[in-house]
Amino acid sequence: MQNDVRPGIRLLTVCGSLQARSANRAAIAVASSLADARGATIDDFDRLADIPAFNPDRAFEHIAVVEDWRRRVAAADVVLVATPEYAGGVAGAVKNAFDWLVGSGHMYRKPVAVISAGTTGGLHARVAMAQTLTWQGAYLVAELGVAAPRTKSDDDGRFTDGATVTAIASLTELLLDAAATPLADLVDLAGGVVGSLGVDAGRVTPAV
């Protein structure tokens, strides 16, 4: 890993939980603090609740919040998604947002990391996000499950468990480094990550 980040790397953070107090929001806070210390520019997209249900018939309409979402994704160098797992799948709000990117090309060859904090660590949510991101041409370069987050947090919901904070920091370092990683290396990295989740690594967008 590199020791620092070139100032100006744009990190887009997306929290899939709409709760006022969320372990996934707390995970993003840890990542954002480290990214800020390394000179990255952080853009936190907090409008998932405003995005309407995806309708292909409206894909080309001028919907302000959707256009804002697409613009901010396109402008990002790297993306961090933290999402809870609901009923064995990814949170509907975050999946809906990424559905609005279908066919846009905004995720093509973009490095992404996924965190899921929840009772069991959100394996199914992480697998679902790996599929969605890979099918959209993104490179999933890191993923992390945080189980039993309440036991790893203080009374205000901030992560205090050293191992958890270190794991989130390591994921963030890897994601930021991915902004300057050669394309062929990103392909190999993403193939290993999605393959470890049981997703077909052959679906990873090739370097050529």
Language model segments and positions:
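Helix-loop-strand module that forms the ligand-binding subsite of alpha/beta enzymes
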Residues: 61-139
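Short beta-strand elements in bilobed, periplasmic/extracellular small-molecule ligand-binding domains
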Residues: 39-53, 140-148
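A general structural signal for well-ordered alpha-helical segments in protein cores
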Residues: 24, 28, 66, 94, ...
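N-terminal beta-loop-helix "entrance" segment that forms/cooperates
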Residues: 46-64, 155-156
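N-terminal beta1-alpha1 ligand-phosphate binding loop
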Residues: 2-39
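Glycine-rich phosphate/pyrophosphate-binding loop and the adjoining helix
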Residues: 2-7, 61, 139-208
